[in-house]
């Protein structure tokens, strides 16, 4: 069964990059052309890199590793939480607290505190033995911990790899992973730095449908890895057929998009078709609180 098709990538807008004035020259090799002032990403390369990332994730999970899903921008929050939960993986979709990886011991203590508060159950009323003020404080603490660390509830150790939507916004998460030697799988938009990612997937990291589709692909790889892990425990090596289908008939304008562009020594060739990408990347915050802020 195919993981994703060329048509799905096109329909989800994965090929739309940023405006030409907002680009990283290191991404030039992933750019197909330029139209209406925006860059168009080469989806043939995207398919190739999806295959590589898929096999890596599947193999990592099959060997017992976990994948941390990271995406705190509005367009990715729902997909990150939904897909990570579906395959039983940890996730961060509210806010990345500095030290979540590099200071995991402290984060783990806060996770234990969150579970303690949840075990207390309903703190309303005096039956629990707390005053109204104490009850209010405990509920606030529980709510704050749940929002920031709820997705890490069952994470007992550092992840084997992380999946990131928007490496520029999640630069602290990427930096921490690199310091610890944790592989990074990520969507690479035309304004990103490919040198920061171990398993890049060239694509649109701003559109909701694009982030959702690519996160589903990673979740599917995790699911296949879990099946393989289970098969090994039973003495078999189950490997579901998984690949990328590119032979589905395409519309004329889609075939035209995939035609070889004219080579240029400078920037990708210009054209005047296709609509301009409207999803702008949210302004990233200049500050990230420390892990201790969750206390």
From Swiss-Prot:
Residues 252-287 have a biased composition (Basic and acidic residues). It holds the Pfam family Ribosomal_S2. Keywords: Ribonucleoprotein, Ribosomal protein. InterPro entries: Ribosomal_uS2 (IPR001865), Ribosomal_uS2_bac/mit/plastid (IPR005706), Ribosomal_uS2_CS (IPR018130), Ribosomal_uS2_flav_dom_sf (IPR023591). Residues 232-295 are annotated as: Disordered. HAMAP family: Ribosomal_uS2_B. This is Small ribosomal subunit protein uS2. The gene is rpsB.
